[in-house]
Amino acid sequence: MSWQAYVDEHLMCEIEGHHLASAAILGHDGTVWAQSADFPQFKPEEITGIMKDFDEPGHLAPTGMFVAAAKYMVIQGEPGVVIRGKKGAGGITIKKTGQALVVGIYDEPMTPGQCDMVVGRLGDYLLEQGL
């Protein structure tokens, strides 16, 4: 299965009648492996900050997390594994695997829990595959 198919079929799938606003699978260096049509382009320094927060949980909390210059308030995640952010009525979940970052961005009516479930399920599968 191609990386694009993972995004299209597993991240952009319908959950209780709702979809993520956008999603992607990125390398740890920010290289895009696959993305949905509306996925924002991360800046290199944003990826650097996200990777540092995985290594040093709490690093982004004082300043917030920036994604394509949009600021997200960092909310409780799983240290070293999942970073969650909130912005208005939406948010973001990023799950780190051995080689990738699985990213889901949502807006209402999708809930943070639904986004976490979609991103977490694919992230767990990639971890099981050694990726």
Curated annotation (Swiss-Prot):
Post-translational events: Phosphorylated by MAP kinases.
Keyword Translocase carried by entry: no
SMART domains noted in UniProt: PROF
Single Gene Ontology MF annotation: actin monomer binding
S-S bridge residues: 13-115
Modified residues (Phosphothreonine): 111
Other comments on record: The variability of the residues taking part of IgE-binding epitopes might be responsible of the difference in cross-reactivity among olive pollen cultivars, and between distantly related pollen species, leading to a variable range of allergy reactions among atopic patients.
Transmembrane region(s): none
Similarity comment: Belongs to the profilin family.
Source species of the chain: Corylus avellana (European hazel)
Name assigned to this protein: Profilin-6
GO cellular component, one term: cell cortex
